[in-house]
């Protein structure tokens, strides 16, 4: 028994050590990438005359007349494309776009294909020989640019380069790829990139064709390309590999006869992980096993023979001896290769070597004074006077190291769904939701009980710190602080601090409600320190740090577990409780069958829209500019600042900002809604909202003509001074009273009277029926809906999506719009009207998934003309950083932004069509535009990863673009082929996937 305990302890310690080492590597390399490496390249290398400088010295000085290399520019394209794909920063995209555009326009040979090896400083061809190595990097960079941005031009250029390699370079008789050619692809006795005149097939070129084809296959999974990948892997397993020494063969002739005896340690360990990656992409398990075994052997050998005493990787060994020069790139590849070998074997020594190498790199290669990395060091670690930027020295090996480690070493954790009001709605295992709903409760058992819940509480707080979510929830008589920490793939750490704020004969509990849909047959076992819940497809265990009092109750058909925190509230008394929750359950990876019926077009979808109510003139423009620049916005809603207009007129800053916003939207070409919140004091009597919660204003019936004149004067001012004739007008949420409140009949009467007034003034502006605070108050629109004399003044029906969006209610709204033949608009779109009180929630993937689920359902069920996001400003912002809600770091898009960008890719004015899915945790919406042949399908996967088979697609469709957004993918795109109207597509866990026929070019 002692041996078992000892082994268990050692195993736990080993796992902890691996986790600590991995986290150091991940965080430190990422920090260097973002704070040193990428900034150096953005600040020092951009050539104002076009593209990038060909040479930058160690001190950061550019040599302006230096030639520009193809490899350098392709690697810049790749590095910043990958950076944008990982982090979504617009500055990275700008660099990537600049690099890709320059590469396509200048480096690609328009006559013979392939790429020029070198240009002069003005971008004209200088060295026109065709090196296959350079062509491979062109494919690599451009395919990554397409993957990150969706720019079809980059993919088309990459495919042409691929075609050139296959037609002119690929040796189909003896396999492999020839090294060098003249410009017109006639063969000549030219030196390859490694300087071997008689070597026509080289290891270096083949491994980089492998990496290029691997990336290309990830965005364009073609069977011919897959065959090429298998051939390349076979070559690296046989013709270019010595199984006796576990080294690669660097140089061969046409017939694969080896030339020379050089062992290149950096290339060996780089190839080890490139082969592993390629084999995984190919998807052949037998091949993958073979490759993995070879990769580990190559890594072990390279480390054994190539590391110096400091843990740095030496360059190479030849018959003349060891080359002890220390170059930057072998260090990067050694670190990735070690991490890859550790992942394949679990051998901690690989991770230890990676950390030692990184420790050396950051103290010797990273230039703390001038930024960037040194290219080469002497044997004793002193920098050599080699340029930081040159044909070969690029932000590729070192940036790729950081990208790979960020992806590979991200901790694999459960994902606990915590609402801002403290309720836990479940724990996700590999995306599968093990659902329950927790709540905090104060009251008496069997009597009145206050429960934490959405929009039930004031002054709640939500924050995240790493993997820990913290909520502070004030309730009557008590305040609760709850922390929830995702620990590993099955474990969550919970902690509660309950503090009594008053003397009450009541108690405080943490409760878990188990829905009957999954727990009707559950067995619940309560012990002093442990609660176990076992149901057919799930198991939950709670282990507490002290004995607890717990009971179960039946509540409305569900089971509820009450765990006592404070048995009685005595002011100042506190109680703490900690628990470890472990969860397990069925992951549903079954294939989803999705069928679309294009023969039954419904209502038109103009596109996604937004609210642009200016409330923060300092921050709003940053978000507005970004949104309008980076996604298609089809509909806009702005504020009429009535009270300010009435008091200060056209020169008031708020009036100007609002009017300028309206003009900007109208110039883009979208319909504009003008909505009013605050009336001037003379126009209304103070009253309460319809729910009695706060003040509102009831318009004075005796001042109707003055009210109408004031409102119309603003609309005329917009038309005359700003060129904007408002398409629609509304009082915001007048069903509730934010801030003008109507009864249903008053709303009807206002539409008729003000509608006629506008017509008499020659304004074409129509009224919104409703613009309700949520979907539940449908009856508010009934008087006008049933009054034919009101219909001619109604331009559209509008509701806000904050509450009540069940299928039955949504269909009522859809039916109402059809009844009077006007469009339906979701005037304010999102899920939580109180979220501005706890804005950290906007950056949560849970919030993003809930929001896009709602929008997908809205599109499918009630088919609105547009959904107008609340907002596309810094309020409820889709961006984070830049001081928005006190967030730090650069301004950057959140997962929510990329979700909405994908939805906004729906073809303009496409028609909603029926779509059904056999999996309940997938929501779907589909659109078609028959005249142009365009269509789109949007899928939200709320569960584990699975394959989806979509049928009913247009028979003429050959390929589609598939975009994926989730917590780690930002509208990442690939092309897939459609066969006979059917498409098979992978749906990652907790993801929003859009399948679109027309690939939109990036916004300019």
Language model feature labels by segment:
Residues 112-117, 597, 630-786:
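Substrate-binding cleft and catalytic face of glycoside hydrolase catalytic domains
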Residues 332, 339, 343-344, 917-958, ...:
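Carbohydrate-binding surface patches
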Residues 487-527:
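Acidic (Asp/Glu-rich), glycine- and aromatic
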């Amino acid at each position: 028994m002692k041996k078992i305990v000892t082994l268990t302890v050692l195993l736990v310690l080993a796992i902890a050590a691996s986790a600590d080492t991995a986290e150091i590597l991940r965080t430190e390399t990422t920090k260097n990438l973002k704070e040193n490496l990428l900034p150096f390249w953005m600040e020092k290398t951009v050539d104002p005359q076009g593209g990038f400088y060909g040479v930058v010295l160690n001190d950061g000085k550019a040599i302006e007349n230096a030639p520009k290399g193809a490899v350098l520019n392709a690697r810049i394209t790749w590095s910043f494309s990958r950076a944008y794909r990982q982090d979504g920063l617009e500055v990275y995209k700008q660099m990537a776009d600049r690099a890709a555009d320059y590469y396509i326009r200048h480096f690609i040979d328009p006559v013979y294909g392939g790429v020029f090896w070198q240009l002069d400083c003005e971008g004209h061809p200088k060295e026109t020989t065709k090196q296959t190595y350079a062509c491979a990097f062109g494919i690599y960079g451009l395919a990554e640019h397409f993957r990150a941005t969706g720019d079809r031009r980059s993919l088309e250029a990459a495919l042409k380069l691929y075609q050139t390699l296959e037609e002119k370079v690929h040796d189909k008789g003896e396999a492999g790829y020839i090294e060098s050619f003249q410009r017109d692809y006639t063969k000549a006795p030219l030196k390859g990139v490694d300087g071997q005149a008689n070597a026509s097939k080289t290891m270096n070129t083949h491994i980089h064709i492998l990496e290029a084809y691997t990336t290309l296959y990830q965005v364009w999974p073609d069977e011919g390309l897959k065959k090429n990948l298998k051939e390349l892997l076979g070559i690296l397993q046989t013709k270019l590999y010595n199984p006796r020494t576990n080294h690669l063969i660097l140089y061969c002739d046409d017939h694969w006869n080896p030339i020379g005896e050089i062992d290149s340690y950096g290339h060996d360990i780089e190839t080890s992980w490139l082969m592993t990656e390629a084999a995984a992409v190919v998807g052949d398990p037998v091949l993958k096993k073979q490759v993995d075994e070879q990769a580990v052997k190559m890594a072990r050998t390279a480390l054994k023979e190539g590391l110096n005493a400091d843990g740095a990787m030496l360059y190479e060994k030849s018959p003349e001896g060891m080359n002890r020069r220390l170059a930057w790139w072998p260090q990067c590849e050694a670190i990735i290769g070690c991490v890859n070998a550790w992942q394949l074997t679990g051998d901690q020594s690989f991770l230890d070597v990676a950390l030692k190498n990184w420790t050396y790199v950051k103290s010797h290669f990273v230039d703390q004074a001038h930024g960037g990395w040194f290219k080469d060091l002497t044997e004793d670690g002193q920098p050599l006077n080699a340029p930081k930027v040159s044909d070969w020295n690029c932000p590729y090996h070192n940036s790729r190291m950081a990208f790979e480690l960020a992806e590979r070493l991200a901790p694999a954790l459960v994902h606990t769904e915590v609402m801002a009001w403290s309720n836990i709605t479940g724990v996700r295992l590999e995306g599968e939701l093990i659902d329950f709903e927790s709540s905090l409760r104060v009251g008496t058992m069997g009597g009145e009980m206050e429960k934490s819940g959405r929009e039930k509480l004031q002054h709640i707080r939500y924050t995240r710190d790493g993997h820990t979510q913290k909520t502070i929830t004030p309730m009557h008589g008590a305040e609760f602080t709850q922390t929830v920490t995702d620990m590993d793939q099955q474990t969550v750490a919970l902690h509660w601090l309950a503090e009594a704020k008053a003397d009450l004969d009541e108690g405080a509990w943490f409760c878990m409600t188990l829905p009957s849909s999954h727990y009707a047959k559950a067995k619940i076992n309560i012990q002093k320190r442990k609660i176990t819940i076992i149901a057919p497809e799930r198991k939950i265990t709670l282990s507490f740090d002290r004995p607890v009092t717990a009971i179960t109750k039946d509540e409305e058909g569900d089971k509820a577990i009450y765990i006592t925190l404070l048995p009685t509230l005595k002011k100042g008394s506190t109680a703490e409780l900690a628990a470890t929750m472990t969860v397990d359950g069925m992951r549903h990876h079954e294939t989803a069958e999705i069928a679309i019926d294009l023969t039954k077009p419904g209502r038109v979808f103009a596109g996604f829209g937004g609210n642009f109510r200016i409330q923060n003139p300092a921050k709003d423009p940053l978000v507005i500019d970004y949104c309008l620049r980076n996604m298609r916005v089809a509909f806009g809603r702005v504020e009429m600042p009535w009270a300010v207009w009435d008091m200060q007129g056209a020169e008031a800053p708020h009036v100007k900002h609002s009017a300028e916003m309206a003009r900007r939207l109208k110039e883009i070409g979208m319909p504009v809604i003008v909505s009013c919140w605050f009336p001037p004091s003379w126009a209304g009597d103070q009253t309460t909202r319809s729910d009695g919660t706060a003040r509102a204003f009831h318009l004075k019936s005796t001042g109707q003509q003055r009210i109408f004149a004031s409102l119309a004067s603003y609309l005329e001012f917009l038309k005359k001074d700003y060129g904007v004739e408002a398409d629609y007008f509304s009082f915001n949420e007048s069903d509730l009273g934010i801030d003008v409140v109507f009864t249903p009949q008053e709303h009807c009467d206002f539409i008729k009277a003000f509608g006629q007034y506008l017509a008499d003034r020659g304004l074409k502006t129509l009224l919104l029926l409703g613009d309700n605070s949520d979907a539940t108050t449908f009856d508010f629109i009934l008087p006008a809906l049933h009054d034919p004399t009101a219909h001619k003044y109604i331009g559209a029906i509008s509701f806000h999506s904050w509450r009540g969006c069940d299928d039955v209610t949504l269909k009522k709204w859809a039916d109402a719009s059809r009844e009077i033949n006007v469009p339906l608009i979701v005037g304010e779109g999102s899920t939580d009207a109180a979220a501005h009180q706890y804005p950290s929630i906007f950056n949560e993937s849970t919030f993003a998934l809930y929001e896009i689920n709602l929008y997908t359902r809205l599109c499918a069920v009630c088919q609105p003309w547009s959904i107008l996001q609340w907002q596309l400003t810094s309020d409820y912002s889709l961006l984070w950083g830049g001081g928005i809600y006190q967030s730090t770091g650069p301004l950057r898009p959140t997962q929510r932004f990329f979700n909405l960008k994908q939805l906004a890719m729906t073809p303009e004015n496409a028609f909603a069509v029926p779509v059904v899915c056999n999996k309940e945790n997938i929501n779907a919406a589909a659109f078609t535009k028959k005249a142009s042949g365009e269509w789109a399908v949007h899928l939200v996967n709320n569960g584990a990863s699975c394959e989806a088979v979509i049928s009913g697609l247009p028979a003429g469709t050959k390929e589609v673009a598939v975009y994926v957004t989730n917590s780690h993918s930002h509208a990442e795109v690939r092309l897939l082929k459609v066969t006979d109207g059917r498409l098979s597509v992978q749906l990652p866990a907790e993801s929003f996937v859009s399948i679109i026929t027309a690939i939109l070019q990036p916004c300019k």
